[in-house]
Amino acid sequence: LVYMGPYSFYLHCVYSETLFMMLIAVFFYYLKKEKGNINNYWISAAAAMLASCTRIVGVILVFPLVLQMYLDLYEGRITFGKLGSFIVHMFKNPVKILQVFLCPAGIFVNMMHLYYVTGDAWAFRNVQAAWREDGAGWIGNMIWDFFNNIYAERYWIPLVMILAIIVYVYMLKCRYYSEVLFAVITLIIPFTGGVMSMCRFIAGSYVVYIGLYDYFADKKDLKWLG
């Protein structure tokens, strides 16, 4: 699925996608392996730290980690009534607090590198001004233009986004809560500027491939695709 996808060319370019996706795979694998095993949280936290060092969006992995800790503590049930007791539980377990803080630590290494190379530790944010005006317009206009000019290359962006959302809804039904949380936040990020990189964010988050694999693997006629 990864190498046959339309955006697999990112994996062959001089980008960090390949390393980033590998770290995400490691993160979620150990996050779900032997649920509640605190040693696996260490591996996931280390993978998240390296991911945040590789790409800034890796910082978001801290949220799936916290959510999975919550789910493991309360046997997969999400209730706001347990939120207070969960916070108390976290403060009583400094090891878990350390694991949570370890996740975004890589961004500081990234910022130090940027400061050394460019003299601007916030270069990853400030450089976005170069891509703000991508001409794609708001998502509503893009969807409208897509149906009026289906052959325009940029108008496939909303279609890819809609298909990704469908996959995420399916994953929610299958109780992939941590994965979907990461995917949704990653999906929101491009809206802070232009949406030119929307497809790259969707493919690079790796989560959509987990959902597609789960779906195809459950279908006898399509099992070979999974």
For each predicted feature, which ranges?
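Multi-pass, polyprenyl lipid-linked donor-dependent membrane glycosyltransferases
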Residues: 1-31, 41, 50-61, 199-206
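Hydrophobic, membrane-inserted alpha-helices
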Residues: 5-6, 44-47, 162-167, 183-190, ...
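Transmembrane-helix signature of polytopic, lipid-linked glycan biosynthesis machinery
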Residues: 7-12, 110-114, 182-197, 211
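Transmembrane alpha-helices and membrane-interface helical segments
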Residues: 26-33, 64-72, 167, 206-223
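Membrane-helix interface segments
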Residues: 34-43, 151-155, 174-180, 219-224
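Membrane-lumen/periplasm interface segments of specific transmembrane helices
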Residues: 50-51, 58-182
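Signature aromatic-anchored transmembrane alpha helix within multi-pass, membrane-resident enzymes
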Residues: 100-104, 218-226
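Transmembrane alpha-helix segments characteristic
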Residues: 170-192, 201, 205, 225
